[in-house]
Amino acid sequence: MADGKAGSLTGKVALVTGGSRGIGAGIVRRLAVEGASVAFTYSSSEEKARQLVREIESEGGQVSAFKADSGVVSDLESAVRQTAETLGPLDIFVSNAGILSLGTIDTYRLEDFDRMVNINVRAAFVGVQAAARSMNNGGRIIVIGSNTAIRTAFPGGTVYTLTKAALTGLVRGAAIDLAPRAITVNNVQPGPTLTEMTSDHVDLVKPLIPLKRMGDVSEIASLVTYLASRDAGFITGASVTIDGGYVA
């Protein structure tokens, strides 16, 4: 940003949903470092959103934050519209917002099921659809899924696994639909990643990972940035797992 060097995404406009903390914030930071003008949504972490905006702007980046509930169609569509009005037509869209609600299938409440599907699947579809409608040809769409789409690694994760597996189908279909416009659509499937939400579980999870460590947010962001770049123009419809061999 401020060092004067052109990054791999200089001149591009990106929108990241759920970008105020964790993996989402790491993606926002990395896209900005690579020269993109970045907008992101947040639902409740307003102070974290403001901090991230100040951080990126202090380093010379261009960033905007929009409050949006990913479960509300009009909020997502408004975020896409506001991004275009503020920064320009979209080149990159990252669907990152998601929730986790655990419960075994014999006890899981239907209300929780509906909310998980609404946020993790329906919102991803709505976001991809809205972004594609306003996106420049040759754009990039990246959905953040989970390695649980491959294997349910813990009891109570049935519905979460279901929602993340659904994203693999969404990406394959959207990749075909948008190929005539040279828009690529891919799915990044992180495994155990060190964030504020997972820090309490490191000692439990780390021994189960062949590389014997948690993933770093910066590693997820690096993969997303590559898929958003010109170099990844022939990759589409793919689900790429990044989990240190956890589901190998």
What are these regions (language model features)?
Residues A2-K5, R151, L204, T225, ...:
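Short C-terminal tail/terminal secondary-structure segment
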Residues V13, S20-R21:
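Conserved glycine-rich cofactor-binding loop
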Residues E34-Q51:
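Conserved glycine-rich Rossmann-like NAD(P)H-binding loop of the short-chain dehydrogenase/reductase
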Residues V128, T163, V171:
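Active-site helix of classical SDR
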Residues R133, I176-D177, G233:
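Alpha-helical segment proximal to the catalytic Tyr-Lys
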Residues A179, T184, I235-G237:
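Short, small/polar-rich loop/turn modules that mediate ligand/substrate recognition or access, typified
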